[in-house]
């Protein structure tokens, strides 16, 4: 199928490499990379300033971890809640913010409550206002996506928030390619 097309768009360099390995001509493959509304986000990034959004909500100055995206099983967000418990057991505390909603929302809320993490976890909910998303991401210390990162990486990186996700790239979404290990995040 690919060999009959005059050209094919793919989301990333890995997909392009895999198709070349399958014998598809490099000249017919174009990596276009995924993104969000870059012009709007660039304007917001240039005008945004630090705020006390997390200090005001949590009533503390702890570092804040954010996840922005759909709260679904493939994101493995239960692992993020488990990590908070491990950190708490080592006397290291962090705030955690979930921006989004999805099929795992109620399960995550129940787990957080059962583990006594209510004061450290904020289920912000779905937010389609890009100015608010910019403030939430910009003021977070780190974005973590234990499962597939997807557009979460693009959203976080555009506002200067480093991203951590898994390093099993054959199971990852193409947006992981935007993360530069040790520079803009890690795997």
Please report, for each region that a protein language model flagged, where it lies by residue:
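Acidic donor-binding loop of glycosyltransferase active sites
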Residues: 135-148, 160-162, 168-169
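Nucleotide-activated donor-binding/catalytic signature segment of Leloir-type glycosyltransferases, i.e.
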Residues: 99, 106-127, 139
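Short hydrophobic "strand-cap" motifs at the C-terminus of beta-strands
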Residues: 11, 32, 67-69, 74, ...
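Short alpha-helical segment that forms part of, or immediately flanks, the ligand-binding pocket
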Residues: 134, 152-159, 176-177
